[in-house]
Amino acid sequence: MSALALSLAMSSNHIAMAQNAVTGTPAAVAAKLMARGDAPEVVTSEMRVVRRNDILTVQSDLHNKGMTDRMVFYRYRWLDNVGNQIGDGESWKQFTLMGQGQQTLKGVAPHSNATDFRLELSFEKK
């Protein structure tokens, strides 16, 4: 098992690796993202993964390094131990990420079968 897989599987581990030179998003975090739309100034700087009461919980920090406000749509996709999606998926949530602002996104797995996740993001200029 790789160091990344171990860090994701263990409770209370932070995913913070070397910064990706292009986006500023750490490589381990970028592996968990699925993004639509163009927003190079929006960086997902850190993800915190915790298993509480056998339920996976994730917090993801987004930072808008630009001056333009962005409408952000997001949802977490929960996966089982072989990579299959669990359940029907979450509905999209939305918020405005102000220029030079930051926001923490929180997600809780629907049940204990979830062992992994992807954060899906979609961006629009406001």
What is the predicted function of each stretch?
Residues 2-11:
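Bacterial N-terminal signal peptides
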Residues 87-113:
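Intrinsically disordered, low-complexity Pro/Gly/Ser/Thr-rich segments with frequent PxxP/GP/PP motifs
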Residues 112-126:
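Short, surface-exposed ligand- or partner-binding patches at beta-edge/loop junctions that are enriched
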